[in-house]
């Protein structure tokens, strides 16, 4: 009886705990400097299921966590995986030599995994 109860409790917990596998993942990112600002292209993979659960944005952050830019994704990409979107006009402070890219989805929020990109 104790084993059955423990197994049932663990099964319920596993269903209610978000899985890293269901979070949006950054597969690649590139940066290009143009004048005083930067353009970023970010490739994301996420098992979009429609409007109820999809990758809905990504951000460019300084190493200290300061958000430098945000790209909102306006619709699901169920049939386009992975997909790449760009953001231009991002001002990166002097002295910042790398940025951290974070993906967001409509159910899990910010992904636990980030992508660090060195700026050249």
Residue ranges of model-derived segments:
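Bacterial N-terminal signal peptides that target proteins for export
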Residues: 1-7
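N-terminal signal peptide c-region/cleavage motif recognized by signal peptidases
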Residues: 14-18
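Short, surface-exposed binding/anchoring microloops in extracellular/periplasmic proteins
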Residues: 22-56
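Beta-strand signatures of extracellular beta-sandwich domains
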Residues: 57-61
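Short, solvent-exposed, Trp/other aromatic-anchored flexible loops in extracytoplasmic proteins
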Residues: 69-98, 104-109
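Short, solvent-exposed mixed-charge patches
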Residues: 90, 119-120
């Amino acid at each position: 009886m104790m084993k059955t109860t423990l197994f049932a409790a663990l099964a319920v917990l596993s269903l209610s705990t978000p899985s890293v596998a269901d979070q949006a993942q950054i597969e690649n990112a590139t940066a290009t400097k143009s004048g005083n600002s930067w353009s970023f292209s970010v490739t994301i993979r996420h098992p979009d299921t429609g409007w109820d659960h999809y990758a809905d944005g990504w951000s460019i952050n300084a190493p200290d966590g300061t958000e430098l830019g945000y790209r909102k994704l306006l619709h699901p990409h169920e049939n386009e995986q992975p997909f790449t979107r760009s953001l231009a006009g991002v001002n990166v402070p002097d002295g910042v030599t790398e940025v951290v890219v974070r993906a967001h989805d409509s159910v899990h929020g910010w992904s636990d995994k980030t992508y660090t990109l060195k700026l050249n």
